[in-house]
Amino acid sequence: MTDAKKLSIVLVVAVSLRLCLGSQPATAQANPTVGGSGSITSYPGRWDLAIKTPTQERASWIELSENKGRLGGLLIGLWGHATPTEIQIKDGEIEFAVPKGEGFPEGTLFHGKLAGGELVGTVTTVNGASWQWAGRRAPSLARKGAPRWGEPIPLFGGKDLTGWTFTDPTQAGIWGVEDGTLIKHGRGSEIVTTSRFQDFKLHIEFNCGPMANSGVYLRGRYEVQIETNATQESPNRRMGAVYGFIAPEPAVPRTPDVWQSYDITLVGRTVTVVHNGQTVIDRQEVPGITGGAIDSNEGSPGPIYLQGTEDGRVAFRNIVITPAQ
């Protein structure tokens, strides 16, 4: 970056407060031009990002907001939670660095611009790798009326893994069926339903060992946290949370080696989570995908997936989904 460009940028703290995150978007001095394609007023909103690495397409997400001529952002990386990031805008193009711990090498830089209503650009890592990325405005997922529910469908029969597949078959050995339960031992692949769903009610029972971590991903994109090890994490990253976005209220106790249940309803972006019969998230909006999402195609049906990339033993049983008709 040139000295002239550095002098044109003044970093400030955003004044908008996201109550569900307990964090503030970081902002930078914007180009004073307003109006028209590529101006600061063209960028605000939620964006579903797709990053094309040499081996696969990865999901990411950013929410951009404008306040008094300044642009701020909250970023979901390849994993992790929504984190403030400083947005620089110059000559109608944006640039931002990925915060530490979001699944990218520290110092990774996004550079992009608006083209045909989409964000397009490059991701450059500190080791010189360069990937293409694109962003589409996230759909509202608003529904016109209450859903009509179909018939319940068991997703796990208790005997084998029929109806499930793995994101990484080479790491599938951590999963197995024991005494009618689906068990994860340690860290490895995610396990994913072969069927995809849009709006649904999901019942799932789980038993989380000491110092263990997993999660239930709705449509493969929104994680409801399961854990007994996040002692230093914020409430919106603990047991019962929609990870990084919505904290359960009241808090869900971490009780290892005990069978517990979630009853989760997802309609559009509206989620309700009931833990052991008590509502802990009541019809709250999920702003966007959570870290580790299988893709960023929020308008499409998606699978149920159980997280396998964290430590510890977690068992599951009685996994039943009731799709909307």
Where does each model-flagged region fall?
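N-terminal secretory signal peptides that target proteins for export/translocation
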Residues: 1-6
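Boundary at the C-terminal end of the N-terminal hydrophobic targeting segment
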Residues: 22-30
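Carbohydrate-interacting regions of secretory-pathway proteins
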Residues: 30-325
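Residue-level detector of intrinsically disordered/flexible regions characterized by low predicted structural confidence
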Residues: 7-11, 26, 203, 319
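Bacterial N-terminal signal peptides
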Residues: 10-22
